[in-house]
């Protein structure tokens, strides 16, 4: 199965092509919020480098948020435009779930994206089982206190809002 994945939730745009469980190609471009100009050329390059066309794609994965509203719309519109003519399947991917999937080990990972004004888009996952412990939501950093203080496993903060959380909760036992 050939999967083309697109991430436009933040300042960095990303495109990856997987064949079954093997990564064939990935590219990230940190050119600010220029996704409307850079995403389609990134996808085109990805497909050409792998000797494929859109007809070879079995599934599109697209970041569905949280993230930049305009960035998400650009990614969703691009994938819809590529998938619709061939009725190719599309799968939404949570930004926070994707961030958690990049981490393994023992403990809990709390993914946090800076939502400004002392808020974060956040979710938490058990690293060993990848089970969700907190649903995706926008929360005040202070509103995470109950979860952080009652977490029974080592707790790691990841994402561009991690420092906000760590600064608030670094004195809580188990926070690493």
PLM regions: where:
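Surface "functional belts" at beta-alpha junctions
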Residues: 22, 89-176
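Buried hydrophobic packing segments
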Residues: 43, 78-82, 99-100
């Amino acid at each position: 199965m050939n999967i083309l994945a697109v991430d436009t939730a933040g300042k960095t745009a990303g495109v990856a092509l997987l064949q079954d469980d093997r990564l064939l190609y990935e590219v990230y471009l940190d050119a600010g919020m220029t996704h409307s100009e850079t995403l389609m050329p990134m996808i085109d390059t990805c497909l050409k480098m792998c000797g494929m066309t859109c007809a070879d794609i079995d599934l599109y994965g697209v970041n569905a948020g949280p993230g930049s509203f305009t960035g998400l719309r650009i990614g969703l519109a691009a994938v819809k435009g590529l998938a619709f003519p061939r009725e190719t399947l599309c799968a939404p991917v949570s930004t926070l779930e994707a961030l958690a999937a990049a981490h393994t080990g023992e403990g809990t990972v709390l993914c946090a994206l800076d939502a400004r004004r002392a808020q974060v888009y956040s979710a938490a996952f058990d690293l060993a089982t990848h089970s969700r412990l907190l649903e995706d939501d926008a929360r005040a950093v202070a509103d995470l206190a109950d979860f952080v203080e009652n977490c029974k496993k080592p707790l790691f903060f990841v994402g561009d809002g991690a420092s906000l959380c760590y600064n608030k909760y670094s004195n809580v036992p188990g926070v690493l």
